[in-house]
Amino acid sequence: QGVSSAASDVYKRQDFDLEDLLRNGPEEKINLTEFSQPTILVTSVLLAKYSNKLSNIDITAGLSLGEYSALVYSNCLELSDAVKLVNYRGRLMQEAVPEGTAGMLVVLNMPINDVYKMIDDINESDETINFSTDNADGVSVLAGKNSAIEACKNYIANGEFRRVKTQMVQMSVPSHCYLLDEAQEELAKLLNEVEFKAPS
């Protein structure tokens, strides 16, 4: 009951129908980062609250968007404030990078030193690619404009990397890269207006 109550309270406070989006889509809208971020946040928080009813959760941690979920679950941040933040965060990101002009590339089975060398080599040309996320050993995520992504694919295809594979991330905006520098500055202004509490 507590989980349903928390969800209902958040649904009522948004300037779009979050509950309908969660239940009915459409997928094209959910894939836009300004909507995917709040839907993922709410879903992950509610799942954590439900899981805690089954067994106590003592520690939370999160990366990127997941950090907001961890802050909410540990009572550092109100869920309604977090939804407001990530919706604004997603909107800023969406506005910063026109849809379809940039992306994120997962590079599998490439030694990390080779990944960094590839980035250096590509950045010495007319392209700019950033190391976005180190997901796991042999799983690197890069971010940049489409032309830089293609440069990475060509670099790998023309090199002696027998087991290396690539895959595009299904996101409308690349994360953790230079293309979002201005969005980061704008988000900081809203973050300064939100109350953060000690975890409990």
Where are these regions (language model features)?
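Single conserved hydrophobic/aromatic residue that forms the stacking wall/gate
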Residues: 1-11
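Alpha/beta catalytic cores of group-transfer enzymes, especially the acyltransferase/condensing modules
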Residues: 16, 74-200
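Acyltransferase loading domain of fatty acid and polyketide assembly lines
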Residues: 16-35
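Alpha/beta-hydrolase active-site loop
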Residues: 38-45
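Gly/Ala-rich beta-loop-alpha elbow adjacent to hydrolase catalytic centers
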Residues: 44, 62, 66, 78
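Conserved acidic catalytic loop of the alpha/beta-hydrolase fold
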Residues: 47-55
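Short beta-strand immediately N-terminal to the catalytic nucleophile in serine-hydrolase-like folds
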Residues: 57-61
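Hydrolases whose catalytic domains are alpha/beta-hydrolase-1, hotdog thioesterase
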Residues: 69-73
